[in-house]
């Protein structure tokens, strides 16, 4: 219950109590007696509830209890507002029966039942909630019990007071009469009223206290209730908070669960995607690998198809090249035929001129003989006379100039001057004339030389490397036995008979008809010519050198002059010997290029070559030339007695001359010169073989001993190459011999040095050269097989022979050295070993060719030993034939040759490597093959060529057989043949290189061969030295060689092949006629 409710209840109770208290009417007595006082009495009667309560309390407790019970009962049956007294008057004798109107005791007691009832029954809106009912009921019960007790007490008090009041009033009535008693009563009543008031006040205080207590209880209860409510609310809030938290937790958990599920789904999705991606990549990789594999297969297939296509194209190209080569060869053959006709006409003219020359020579010789007889007592005077005669002969000889060109376009030498060399004696004159004629004839290259025919003297360039060799070694026309040579020289049989003595003619025939003449003849002529050649060589060389010394060959360096002076000192004997034994050598005496040509380079080179051969020290002039020349000189020595003799004659290849062996001035007397040059040359040869490089170095040094030949091959890019048809083995040997100096060069170097030294010093009889040649031939034949080795061995033989020969070493030194073991040596001196295959002249031409080849080979040895292989291969019969062809020095550009040379050069340029060797080899092989055609032509065109033609045909057949074998081998070893080509020379030619070179060179080879065959037919050179112009460098590329060959100043070039050699190579076939022309 709220405090407000409690206070309301208290007021209600008080109201009830007030209603229940009824005061009776004032006693009448009172009213009457005390009118005014009555009012005061009424006033004194308690009006307020407190008063009533105080009166009630004064009622006796019994009464109050009774009343309570009664009032209780009545209250239950009537509204609380009505007083119970009206309905049931109290029984008499009780306090309730007291009528207050009359007596104060009659005042009915207060009935508090209604208040109790009201208190017990609260309005609906004030009822406590069920939760609190229990507490409130207990509170009310306590509260009402206490109130009831208080009311009962109050009633008792009231009743007692009323009773007392009645007693008092009764007493008053009793004592009314007396005022005193009345005032006393009033005082007592007043006291009672005061006491009642006090009691009422006390009661009121109690009631107030009770109310406060109740209020406190109520407030406490309210507080407790609020606290409870707050607690409940807090609990509720906590519950709600817990529920909210739980909800949040559930939500969070749910969210986390969903997040986890989502994450798992994403992870699963990712893994699935990754797996799909991986599978996709694997599939792509697989496809890519498959594609790559397929592409690789396609590429491999394409490559295979491309390779097949390339092979087919290569095969077609090769076939086309072969066809083109064949066509070129045919063209060359046709051209050679035309050139042969031209050459024959030119030879006829030359023969006529030579007849005149021979006549003049004969007269000169007779005059010289007479002078010699007259001055025989005085050697010095005799020497001077010979020098004078030599000069006269030289003067009488009209130089002839010709142009050397390689191919149609490239001109190696715009103008080559050949000055005829006339022997000092009549013999020399004749030989010189003959040689001159031979040179002129041989120089169909001489068409350019207007003076060729007019000159009666043999040009000092005994060998025209351009492909023309002097017809024979004979110093005099008489010595020329070869009909081919005669035809080349334009000499008739009568003219030839007019030539120098038969001994010379024997030698020259040996050399000239070395091809056509039987081996016996060549051997006989060789023997005779050995002595004659040595003597003639010495005389011619000395004369030449004297002329050079005296300024005839002003272009010669001092070396030429020195040798000339030396020669002059020793010339008398040398010259005579040369004339007598000169046969081929004297005839082939080569005018020093320096003398002949103003070009300092040519001169220096030629001279250097001369000296390099004769006096290597002098040779220093042109180190490159010297380098090559020593080897060339060595080669020349090894090549053939002719070439060697030419070398001995101090002939050198003029640097400017495409390929001329020009006499290099002897250092001293022919003997001393030869010994000097011979030893140097031998050393050089040996050195050049072992030292091709050394030879080159020596040449450069110029101190190198000149080759005993006295011939310095002019050093150019090209080297003379002697082509003998040989087996591939022979070719290889020849290659090694020439190129490596293993075959020819080494022996040449060794032999030349030893034999030259010995020959020069010993000056053994010219026979020794013959023997040496013979030995060389014998040795050379084997050396064909193993040319490099054999050539060395043969060279030593040559040396020993040369040593034996030393009396005439100067003349014969060349033969001694010339018996180039590789090829030239064998055929040169003693055709006997080869007679079966060749006439002595043939062998001689071979020898000269070999000697030249050797020189060339040595030169080419410097280059790469290309030539060596060629000569070594040729050492066989085929070799000799090839040698003959080789002996032609294709270098000299005879007009008809120039064209073929140019073609061959072009061809070589096209196929340089093959041409370099192949043209040589192929030219040789072709010479053998084409040789028959050329030989036939030559035979048909030349009367004296019948025998040579037969020999050549035989050789040609052999060569063709060899060529077929070589070609087969070359084809088989085509891949490896480049080296072999050099080594195999001829066989290489047949090989692919051969095809290539032949394609490039076939023209040259065919032309050379044909020309050589023609030359061989002419057989002016007993040993046809087929000098093929080969790259001194074994490197097959002929184009380079050609370019090198072209420059006349190439002497400096280390590649020893002179330009003329290159031409010779290119023109190998065309030059097949050259050896004969040279002869």
UniProtKB/Swiss-Prot annotation:
Q: Where is the composition biased (Basic residues)?
A: 115-134
Q: Does the keyword Calcium apply?
A: no
Output compositional bias ranges, type Polar residues.
420-434, 670-682, 756-781, 984-993, 1020-1033
List UniProt keywords, sorted A-Z: Cytoplasm
- Ranges for region Disordered: 1-293, 308-327, 341-383, 420-453, 493-522, 606-639, 658-1054
* InterPro entries named among the record's database cross-references: Actin_dynamics_regulator (IPR052853), DUF4592 (IPR028030)
Q: Which GO terms describe its cellular component?
A: cytosol
Q: Give the compositionally biased regions (Acidic residues).
A: 36-45, 140-158, 684-695
Q: Where is the composition biased (Basic and acidic residues)?
A: 1-11, 64-76, 159-293, 896-930, 944-983, 994-1016
Q: Which GO terms describe its biological process?
A: epithelial structure maintenance; maintenance of gastrointestinal epithelium; negative regulation of barbed-end actin filament capping; positive regulation of actin filament polymerization
In terms of one coarse class, where is the protein primarily found? cytoplasm
- Name the source's superkingdom: Eukaryota
Cellular localisation: Cytoplasm, Cytosol
One Pfam family, short name:
DUF4592
**Quaternary context:** Directly interacts with actin-capping proteins; this interaction decreases the binding of capping proteins to actin.
Stated role: Involved in epithelial cell integrity by acting on the maintenance of the actin cytoskeleton. Positively regulates the actin polymerization, by inhibiting the interaction of actin-capping proteins with actin.
Q: Which PANTHER family match?
A: CANCER-RELATED REGULATOR OF ACTIN DYNAMICS (PTHR47574), CAPPING PROTEIN-INHIBITING REGULATOR OF ACTIN DYNAMICS (PTHR47574:SF3)
Q: What is this protein called?
A: Capping protein inhibiting regulator of actin dynamics
Q: Which organism is it from?
A: Danio rerio (Zebrafish)
Give the encoding gene's name: crad
